[in-house]
Amino acid sequence: MWVERDGGQLCDWGKRKEIMRRVIISIIGVSLAVAAAGQDSQDQHQSFDVNVPQAPLPVLSDGRVMLAYELHITNFTRGKLQLMELRVLAGESGRTIADFRNQDLIDRISIVGAPAQSPTGSVVAPGARAIVFIELQLAPGERLSALRHELDYGLPDGTVSTLRPEATSVSMRPASVLGPPLRGGPWVAVHDPTWPSGHRRVTYTMGGKVRLPGRFAVDWVGTDAAGRISTGDPDHPSDSIGYNADVLAGADAEVAAVRDNMTESTSIQHNPAHVLGEGAGNFVALRLGPDRVAFYEHLRPGSIRVRAGEHVRKGQVIGSLGFSGDTTGPHLHLHVADCDQTLQCEGVPFTIEAMSLLGRYHNIADLGQHPWSTEVVRKPGSPEWPSYNVVVRFPSPLQVRSTHEASRVVLSNVSALGPAMHMPGQAHYEQQ
């Protein structure tokens, strides 16, 4: 090694060569990184934040296993994004379970903050959130532990991109099995996931979290063989078929909460609006098990026969069907939730045993005017969640007692299958 005096400085050419080598390598590395970043920038852009706040829970309905859940999709970009197509895939096999596009997708979208009665379309503005309501029917015998989603969306420049969020786990917890909430019939299970202001789509944000208590809520409306819902003045609650009918406990349970201090309007047409939290009217909440509470709402004033902390037996009369709270007509609201608060819980599925299916109203506007369609007449072999607007008949009091005795024997042999489950709600029983 040798050194040279240059301008008064000693230059170690070995070190100089090493420094130059490192500089060249650094320049090449930076150039490659810039080139790579330029290439990536052509493929990368901001998109949606996708969240599934409540894991899908399976339930038997219409003879098939179904799932009901929501995708919360928030636009964090500075431009409008358009939802174009949503595919739901089985997490294990990759099989396409559902493919929503065009009007079918638009009908499932609710833009947070938009008027409930106005069409929201599929365009999500910057900072806005869309909720996509999803109902799936699985293939016979199919069991899923996870779901995957593929979302095609349009960018402001007209290009289309595909978003593939992380897989969503499917809960394996079984639905709670309830006894009949009423006797006899016919009773119409009024609910429909497509109604903009129906239980299925009414969210509440309290305590810093958005929840959907009425995800599986059912409103039971009494009718007769001709499809009428009133035997006298249609504006008088007491003339409604089903008014004052006994409401039955669906399980051996502890009474978690009771409210019985609300009056009823004497006019259906002029029933006043109620403040948030009083829409359920008079109600009884039964604790079925860990994180599972059944709500029986809109009960007649003075009819509740139980108090908080008491224990009730399956089939025991707990109150009477009424017209208290926010409702467009006398009915029994039933849902199951994961806590004992009417609005601060997540709705979970439940099934009802010992009911016979008489038919269905394909257009709920026909209820009160015409008989139902009878093409779905059957008696389920297993407890089911009542499907949309089906008409059912429950056992008579004598049949209820015999059914309860038989179910105690069956349940004693299958207690290892796991705890029960339920769900919450609070909305009108008519299409909004």
Residue map of PLM features:
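Short, solvent-exposed loop/turn segments enriched in Ser/Thr/Gly
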Residues: P53, G63-E70
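Terminal connector regions
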Residues: Q137-V177
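Zn2+-dependent peptidoglycan hydrolase active-site motif and core
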Residues: G242, E254-R300
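Asparagine-centered strand-capping/turn motif at beta-strand->loop junctions
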Residues: I73-K80
